[in-house]
Amino acid sequence: MRPFSCSAWIASIHRGIDVARANALPHVIGSTGATSENFAKKRYDLPDIALLDMGDFVGGMLKYMRKNPVPRLTIAGGFGKLVKMSQGAVDLHSARSQVDFERLATLATPLGLRHDAVANANSVLEIVQMSDPDQRHALASIVAGQARDAARTYLKRDDIAIEILVISRDGALLGQAGLGQAGSLEL
């Protein structure tokens, strides 16, 4: 493996968007890693040129899409990274953004999770493990909705349909936001 710079990674995201636009693709997927990319690829059966390995750089992707739009964007990622995105982070790397567990506890408490347990958790994975499937789905869906709102705010455009998919470590859908009636995406 050959390491490369953050700026080179972001440039590769930009080139991916350029290729998608040059091929008139109506839908691209920005993923934080292989597990979320594999889930989204199976779900939508899109060509490889529609897959953007954004990694931690959701901000770099969204900023470029402001001036280089694609009609439909799916952002797929792990729970922890999308919690950070829902809280306004645009660089999702652990060294550059952290989860506000107190804020997450405020969302989780009405779902039946103990406020102090969530607020004092060491990781989002710990919260996933302490929640039952219904709580996990509800919390992931709330996080997805807030991440979608954060993406829309950062993107500064209303003409791109945005969907958020929260994917578990084992590749299952935990929650989502952005689907409207009859499976169409809300703008």
Residue ranges and their predicted role:
Residues 1-71, 81-82, 86-187:
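N-terminal loops that bind phosphate or other acidic moieties
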